[in-house]
Design a protein with these regions (language model features):
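Short, low-complexity N-terminal intrinsically disordered segments enriched in polar/charged residues
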Residues: 1-23, 27-31, 35
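A solvent-exposed, acidic/Ser-Thr-rich amphipathic alpha-helical stretch
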Residues: 26-91
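A beta-strand edge to alpha-helix "cap/lid" segment located at domain peripheries
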Residues: 62-133
Length: 133
């Protein structure tokens, strides 16, 4: 039963991650990510590697604004829990609009995450995606 509760908590954690990005809510994002978070985004047209909560907050602060915004839908999670750690694979469908560059990106990717339980709360320890299209 505990494993099912942990999986549900991790699903809600990932939902808050996407909502934090899409609403530019850095305070919410900070509650989702571990202090030593590692993030990697891999696409044919860009690559980002981010280490630590401060670098992550700076990245999201600059990447998503009132002129650069997105919609992230994560679904069909595959989550495995092992005590106070867990892994997850999620499909992503997203849309990113950049008014400054007058571009729209839409596509899909596979997120691969590692989670850790800190003081009784799940946090994203490592996250990132590889673009599928």
């Amino acid at each position: 039963m505990q494993t099912l509760l942990d999986i549900e908590e991790i699903k809600q954690l990932k939902a808050r991650y996407f909502r934090g990005i899409d609403t530019c809510n850095l305070e919410l994002l900070k509650t989702v990510l571990a202090d030593a978070v590692h993030i990697r985004f891999d696409s044919p047209t860009y690559q980002y590697e981010i280490n630590g909560i401060d670098e992550a907050m700076n990245f999201y602060r600059n990447a998503f604004t009132h002129r650069r915004f997105g919609m992230h839908h994560g679904h069909t999670p595959e989550i495995r829990v092992d005590g106070d750690t867990a892994t997850g694979i999620w499909y992503l469908n997203d849309l990113f609009i950049n008014l400054d560059e007058q571009t729209i990106l839409t596509g899909s990717a596979l997120y691969e995450d590692c989670y850790t339980r800190v003081a009784g709360q799940w946090r994203v320890q490592r996250t990132g995606y590889k673009r599928l299209l």
